[in-house]
């Protein structure tokens, strides 16, 4: 079971907390700094916050929503999201969400294909599967774009996917060399730190991040909402973990009884569906159900 502690600093590993910190216009400088570090080929001077909702592209009865959506001073749109738990179809989901704004571009151009340059940055608290695992032993950022296979010629900048696999970032605190690595570490451990570490206190950027994420500095109502959110997160995560553990146990038992691997897979699949139905009846959000069970949002909406 997951024991979520509420410490001195906001736990920005959580998607809603991340959005609350980096989505505030008062903290725009922090988001600009983070994006310039992750997207090292860009030089973002300013950005404009955009709506994260996409009208007309409902999944069941639920609108599609991004964690953070901004436009840079150069006109490039950047979408930022945090994903805590793995999903069996995560890469397909990422491509699907990358396509949604393109449809919006076409609508805005009234049928003309005037597509905006767009980058989707996903901070993942897990590891993706890659064909060449050796390359990823010391690398946690992957970049995908639309290019010709042999020559590398660029087809379009309408879809660029950047995955930061924080599940691969293992550097200890004392070995962090730069602000990018310090950001990665904070995205993993901010909520656990009792104070700003000495190695980070030397960085003006890190001092700023720690200042705005100190829980006691929050307005009273915002602090109350944070405590409520983290408590609810703990309760939901524990329910989900229990359901997943039960589902795995039952699936394994059925597989042994039938003597076939198919039996185990089928048992696990049925338990995931059962857990999803139960969570849905309790009013748990589709996004959390999807993260917990590995089912797609479309599959959950159909239950």
Annotate the PLM regions.
Residues 1-303:
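Elongated, amphipathic alpha-helical interaction scaffolds
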């Amino acid at each position: 079971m997951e024991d979520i502690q509420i410490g001195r600093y906001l736990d920005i590993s959580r998607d809603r907390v991340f959005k609350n910190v980096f989505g505030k216009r008062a903290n725009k400088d922090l988001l600009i700094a983070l994006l310039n570090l992750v997207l090292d080929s860009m030089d973002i001077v300013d950005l404009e916050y955009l709506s994260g909702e996409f009208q007309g592209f409902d999944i069941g009865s639920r609108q599609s929503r991004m964690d953070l959506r901004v436009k840079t001073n150069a006109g490039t749109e950047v979408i930022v999201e945090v994903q805590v738990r793995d999903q069996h179809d995560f890469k397909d989901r990422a491509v699907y969400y990358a396509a949604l704004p393109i449809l919006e571009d076409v609508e805005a151009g009234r049928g003309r294909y005037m597509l905006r340059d767009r980058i989707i940055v996903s901070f993942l608290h897990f590891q993706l599967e890659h064909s060449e695992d050796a390359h990823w032993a010391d690398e946690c950022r992957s970049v995908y774009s639309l290019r010709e296979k042999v020559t590398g010629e660029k087809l379009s900048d309408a879809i660029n996917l950047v995955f930061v696999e924080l599940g691969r970032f293992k550097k200890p605190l004392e070995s962090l060399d730069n602000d990018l690595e310090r950001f990665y570490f904070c995205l993993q451990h901010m909520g656990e730190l009792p104070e700003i570490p000495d190695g980070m206190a030397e960085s003006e950027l890190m001092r700023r991040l720690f200042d705005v994420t100190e829980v006691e500095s929050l307005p009273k109502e915002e602090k109350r909402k944070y405590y409520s959110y983290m408590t609810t997160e703990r309760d939901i995560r524990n329910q989900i973990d229990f359901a997943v553990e039960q589902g795995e146990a039952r699936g394994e038992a059925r597989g042994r009884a039938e003597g076939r691997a198919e039996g185990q897979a089928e048992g696990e699949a049925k338990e995931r569906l059962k857990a999803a139905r139960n969570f849905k009846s309790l009013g748990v959000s589709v996004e959390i159900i999807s993260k917990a069970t590995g089912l797609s949002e479309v599959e959950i909406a159909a239950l």
